[in-house]
Amino acid sequence: MKNLVTHLHHVFPNVNGSIKALAFNSISDKIYVVCGLDNENPGIEIYEISENDDVSKLVEFDSPSFVSDNGDIDEIQSMQFLGEPMAICLSLKGGDIVMVKVDPSPEEAPWEIIGNVENGIVASCWSTDEQVFCIITGGDTILFMTKNFDIISETSLSDADLNEFNKHISVGWGRSETQFRGKRVRAKLRDPTLPEKIDEGKLSDVDDGKTYICWRGDSQYVSINRLEKGPRRAIRVYSREGLLDSISEPQDGQQSLLSWKPSGSVLATIKSDSSDNSSKVIFFERNGLRHGEFSLRRREDEKYTGLAWNVSSSILAVSTENSVMLWTTGNYHWYLKKEINIPQNALISWHPEHANTLYITGKNHIEKVVFDLKYVTEFSTSPNDFGLIPVIDGSSLLVTPLSLCNIPPPMCRYKLSLDYNVQMTSINATSDMLFAADDRRLTAFTFNSQEDIAKFGEFDISTYAEGLNFKSLLGLSGNQVLLLADGTNNCSKFFVFQCDEDNESLKLLASESFESCILNASYCSEMLFFQTSSGKLISYNLNVKSIESISLSFPKPCSDFVVVPVHETFVPIGLTSYGRLYAEQRLLSTGVLSFFCTERFVLFTTTKNLLKFVHLVSTVDDLQVVEDDAVDRHDERCRVVERGSKIVASMPSKMAVVLQMPRGNLETIYPRIMVLDGVRTYIKALKYGDAFKVCRTHRLDLNILFDYDPDLFLKNIPVFVDGLYRVDYLDLFLTSLKPENVTTGMYSDTSKSQSQQSVTTIDNKVNLLCKIIREHLTSKYGDTHFQAIITSYLCESPPKIEAALGMISGLIKAQSETVDLAIEHMCFLVDVNMLFDHALGLYDLKLALLIAQQSQKDPREYVPFLHEFQKQESLRRKFNIDCYLKRYERALGHLKEMENAFDEFKNFTIQHKLYPRALELYKYDKEAQKEVLIIFAQYLRENGKSNEAAIAYESVGKISEAIEAYKSAGMWRECLSILQQTTNSEDLIRETAEDLASLCIEKREHCDAGSINLLYLSNPREAVIQMCKGSQYSEAIRIARATGDSSIYKDLLISVLGESFGEASELVADFRNQIKSQTERILVLREKKKEDPISWMEGTMEDQTPDDISLASTSLSTNRSLYTQYTKSSNSSKMTRNTSKNNRRLERKRARGKKGTVFEEEYLVNSLRRLIARVEEIRPEVHRLLEALVRCNMTTQASELQRNFANVIGTIGEKVIPILSVPVSTFETALGEQPQAPVVPNVKPFEKLSILI
């Protein structure tokens, strides 16, 4: 759908002499032309044209060999600039090969004839990599030479090759003969691999008899189009080593011109077709088989002088005696994009590096034409953004309004036929007029929203074209149009015309000449902006018709640019031919394939298959371009598109972007950023209905209707409801509500910074909206929108199912005809079984019956079920319904209200463990509450809560049960106190105290056992023993001294303290020995690991773990599907069992810490940690023991114990803590996991008794 737009049509100054050939110096961007070899000048003159268009003579020379013996002057067969020797190579028809130095040293000759080819040169051509030189001699031989002119091969062009290689077979793919047309269609029996007519290779009447050579773009093959004996034309293909690869099949009317597509797919030549009196471009594959064609739309006898592909293989130039046609292709259709008038028999040449630069060489001048392939579409605003795209195809203009219909090319919505080949086209700013022109005529068409295109008029512009070359066309506002032309001396001029429909005349509104070359123009708000060849922008005010001074420019000239109005300023956006996108002087992105501007965005596609959006702001520096990884963050300003996609048009009113794929087809997408922008615009305008429809169409979260502006929404609830109006739309909105604010996440407004975004937080948002909308619907649309009202109940959190059912109950009582619809709607929103249960919970059997009728329940089941309830008395019915619904607490309440049902009440309470509820129901009936409390106490004791049971028993006067419960709970104080209060039996009290003392000793509660012996058993000796065992030495001393029995103090207490001292000393010694042995072993292990870590790791094999068992985790985390979650066995479950088994084995090895394994160090370190914990645990006990020893005059033992224990704690600080500060090398760290930072315990010094030595 692209058109060829001319940026530059420059005529170089005249060269003195007749130009014979042209060559390009891509290194310094210079051009060399050869003149002479005619009657006026039999010698050779070479001129150099610099990049600044300065013409200077490079060299002039002559040689006797340039003129033959019979007086004929030699001809140039090829001219090539060679980069490595920095020389021009000329091959002459007489056989001379001349090398001309472009920058010779003083001692070098500027030119040299390096050799002569015997029998002359018929054709010659250098390969594109300048490494191989191919020559066809007059002796029917083909020579392949290196760049140093060493012969690679010399082969005779034998006619026998035609017979040997003329065995082309086509299997007929794609032909009608090979297509299946139905089994009943009788087809003529024939071989589909053979054509119906076999060409003999008859020569065209306009064949010039010349031989052409053309290399493939990668220089691996060369093709030769020459006359063979017969005579017929044949294309031979040779490898760069000189081996014949193929010969083309014969074609009637084939001409001599030849051009190999640089991409290498096909060879192009021209054929005169007498069957339809036309000329065609036909294509051959490298193997010589035909591969497509297209008509040149010319007569059979038309003479063609040139055929050339541009370097990018996108344009095919075909020249006749007085014009050059430029063809492009897309979707298997060939478009005639431009036809340029040229001097008689001029030569055409494409620049070898600049793909869209064409040189036309006349007799004594050179024209340079620079094109750009671009979509003809202009910056337009809503609602005039129809996406009107005109496509030039010869004398036809193919027009498609993409907003109304997306028709892939080459098809179109309108085909406008003109009397001339269209050179340029444009649409105006409001997309209601279309213009087409060549260099003499301008035609205008009108377009309206009813999809009609009518001819407005045709106007003569030839009177303005004298000395100018019209190159581009730009529609302005209304029926105004701008024509841009290039003149001589690298200057430009523009005309602004107004088309008059009445007299079909043009009114010149403005005109201006520029001394510099203008590449292209843009129109914006009655301002014209022109870009010079240096990238500078010039503005022209159409209102005052004068040039205004502006400081806008691009760093480099842009092949396409547009000026966008943003907040009363102008922002120029331009794209260079090298894919660099600029906003004035700022580089926005590189690798850009296409761009488009709307009122709010700059859109562009990149070579990384991304479509990006940039919010337009008035300051260029504030334009934010997201990085490529933004697509992974789901940023709305970046999205993935198909590879090679280019933007054709963007239509903000449709929120659409039309992309064209490399193969030519169109695709319309709706980017989220444009859709959201449209939704926000609708919300601001209170067009909630339109915003809702957009969200519904593009599957946006409907919460944005509220979250974007909650205050605006809450103030305009009637507007919102009236905008949606339809019940199903309101239902959809209500069911889509959720508590989250979508504008803070996926739908955040990226045009604002985080500080600019104000987020209004609404607590309980869903319930609030449901309530407000329900209130409005109830007051205004209660009779028609009952369905939406029900939805509002069910969408609250939690759902108000009972309220909705209550509403339906009201409809039933009112005998409304909408009851069935309401119930059906509820069954759609909520599980019908749940609704049935809730209806039962309301004790409304009629409502439950109606709901059951909407379900899949069997009437033979639910009808008797409901009938059974219907027969029961009201309280019994409610009780049974609550039991069915497992609402046991409610059922218990109904049971309490029944008469003579207290026993059933107690049994029901016991059955369902409803003791707290039962106590609450009878909180004002003390007798009943007492009975409930007794059964509750029984339950508590049976479930291991004897302490609570004992309290309950005691509160209701069940003393014996309370005593037993207290004993079970070990609460000796409560047990003995209640026993002393209720009985005078000393024996019973003593027996109970003995039992309790024994229980305390079993539970290692020695202090409690001592208290019982002292207070209730009058056994001070046992009390002293138990107090010492409980480390309560001070209490033991007090009891011993209080008895007044010296034997208890001297014999028993001293003896028990001695035992405690011995146990403590033994424990401290064990600590010391463990610290010594384990710290030494850890240091040894760490030293070995440092010296030989591999051997340390191999220590894991000492336990003879089988080789096929991995100790590392191999568990897989997979999500179960709906089907696999119910299977009995699977590979993953087996693997889980195996892995769990390995993990348990690994933990057992870790716990053992076997010597020599990788687990040993970890085991020893953990053992030291446990030792420190044990030392800290007994620290207060040792301190109390020291005090007791001193008080009993056992200072020697106290000093010894204090010294040893203090030494242990000191050793821990000196030796153990440094070891614990180093991360432990566990089995996991050996497998590559990161070690965890160690937790070092804080061990304080032991607080000694200062009175001890």
UniProtKB/Swiss-Prot annotation:
What's any GO biological process attached to this entry? tRNA wobble base 5-methoxycarbonylmethyl-2-thiouridinylation
Q: Does Transferase count among this protein's keywords?
A: no
Query: Chief localization class?
Result: cytoplasm
Subcellular localization, as worded in the UniProt entry:
Cytoplasm
Q: In which pathway does it act?
A: tRNA modification; 5-methoxycarbonylmethyl-2-thiouridine-tRNA biosynthesis
A single GO cellular-component term on record:
chromatin
What SUPFAM superfamilies does the record point to? Answer: WD40 repeat-like
Which Pfam families does this one have? Answer: A-sol_ELP1, Beta-prop_ELP1_1st, Beta-prop_ELP1_2nd, HB_ELP1, TPR_ELP1
For the region Required for binding to tRNA, what residue ranges are annotated? 1137-1155
- Where are stretches of biased composition, namely Basic residues? 1142-1153
Record keywords: Iron included?
no
Residue ranges, annotated region (Disordered)? 1126-1153
Q: What are the Polar residues biased-composition ranges?
A: 1126-1141
User: According to its UniProt record, which protein family does this protein belong to?
Assistant: Belongs to the ELP1/IKA1 family.
Q: Could you tell me what this protein is called?
A: Elongator complex protein 1
Source organism: Schizosaccharomyces pombe (strain 972 / ATCC 24843)
Q: What is the lineage of its organism?
A: Eukaryota, Fungi, Dikarya, Ascomycota, Taphrinomycotina
Protein encoded by which gene: elp1
